[in-house]
């Protein structure tokens, strides 16, 4: 089926979303145009407003509409703990744990093959943030448990060691409520390597 130029443009725009392929984009476009034009208009307005009004927090670099995000503006948070994550979605995930420290959001992870070095992901800004604050005693490296995430955490840990700060890594392994037979070998090996004694 051949679509008109405007429909084709809408389909191509929808395909920029993660996980949306050609067929899904076509279904979405036709749904909005045939059955939910008011929803399509709301979507277009919300997207336009977000693209214009949402920027980055000047301290932690997460997404926000204000100069400081709610976490950085909160004076009741623990100024001795800094949690470093790969992206804004990670901040929301860590917040669900009850973490009450501060954040710094990298722009991804080190990936030399993709041309992403320390400068590209914001490691110099991270080090400047640590220096400027002067209150952090521990930096929690909560990068993803991938080869690139581990390399990024290791690189940052080396920089922090030179400054006399504690660098810790979030634990990885068997998920709470998970069954061993369903866990992949790499995850299980990581769990065994990071085992801890049971405190009674």
UniProtKB/Swiss-Prot annotation:
SMART domains: TOPRIM (SM00493)
Keyword field: DNA damage, DNA recombination, DNA repair, Metal-binding, Zinc, Zinc-finger
GO MF annotations, alphabetized: DNA binding; zinc ion binding
GO BP terms, alphabetized: DNA recombination; DNA repair
One protein family per Pfam: RecR_C
Presence of keyword DNA repair: yes
Zinc finger annotations (C4-type) as residue ranges: 57-72
Limits of the Toprim domain: 80-175
Cross-referenced InterPro entries: DNA_Rcmb_RecR (IPR000093), Rcmb_RecR (IPR023627), Rcmb_RecR_Znf (IPR015967), TOPRIM_dom (IPR006171), TOPRIM_RecR (IPR034137)
Role: May play a role in DNA repair. It seems to be involved in an RecBC-independent recombinational process of DNA repair. It may act with RecF and RecO.
Family, as annotated: Belongs to the RecR family.
Name of the molecule in the record: Recombination protein RecR
Protein encoded by which gene: recR
């Amino acid at each position: 089926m051949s679509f008109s130029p405007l429909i084709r443009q809408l389909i191509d725009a929808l395909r920029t979303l993660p996980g949306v392929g050609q067929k899904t984009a076509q279904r979405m476009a036709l749904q909005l145009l045939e059955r939910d034009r008011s929803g399509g208009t709301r979507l277009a307005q919300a997207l336009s407003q977000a693209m214009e009004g949402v920027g980055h927090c000047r301290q932690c670099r997460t997404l926000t509409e204000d100069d400081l995000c709610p976490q950085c503006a909160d004076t009741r948070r623990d100024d001795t703990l800094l949690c470093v994550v790969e992206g804004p979605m990670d901040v929301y995930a860590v917040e669900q744990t009850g973490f009450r420290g501060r954040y710094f959001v990298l722009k991804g992870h080190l990936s030399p093959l993709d041309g992403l070095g320390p400068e590209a992901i914001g490691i110099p800004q991270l080090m400047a943030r640590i220096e400027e604050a002067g209150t952090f005693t521990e930096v929690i490296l909560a990068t993803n448990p991938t080869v690139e995430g581990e390399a990024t955490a290791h690189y940052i840990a080396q920089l922090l060691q030179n400054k006399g700060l504690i660098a810790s890594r979030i634990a990885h392994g068997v998920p709470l409520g998970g069954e061993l037979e369903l866990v992949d070998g790499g995850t299980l090996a990581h769990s065994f390597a990071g085992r801890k004694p049971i405190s009674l």
